[in-house]
UniProtKB/Swiss-Prot annotation:
Family: Belongs to the UPF0145 family.
Annotated organism of origin: Methanosarcina acetivorans (strain ATCC 35395 / DSM 2834 / JCM 12185 / C2A)
Residues spanning the membrane: none
Entries under InterPro entries matching the protein: UPF0145_dom_sf, UPF0145_YbjQ-like
Disulfide-bond pairs as recorded: none
PANTHER family to which the protein is assigned, alphabetical: UPF0145 PROTEIN SCO3412 (PTHR34068:SF2), UPF0145 PROTEIN YBJQ (PTHR34068)
Name of the protein: UPF0145 protein MA_3383
Amino acid sequence: MIIATTDTIAGKEITKTLGMARGSTIQAKHLGKDIMSGLRSVVGGELTEYSKMLEEAREKAINRMVEDAEKMGADAVVNVRFMTSMVMAGAAEILAYGTAVKIMNR
């Protein structure tokens, strides 16, 4: 499965648009990691616990988007975007979405 943030793929022609593919996950903070991040935010520096959590969440959302596109029979997903929203205190949703398409070589 080709995943692209652009609306075209070099060397490929989009032959059919299948619809929006999407995948999401909701991640909550871990109390122990939250305390460490709180301390780090006071003294400065990267909040590595949150960076890792968000990286894992993005990967889960991408994988779920790909599964959704595969169900539609897609060869690729173009115009891929991410969106983050707070769903409750201490929890965030990561949404990956794009256009599922059929492609062929030029």
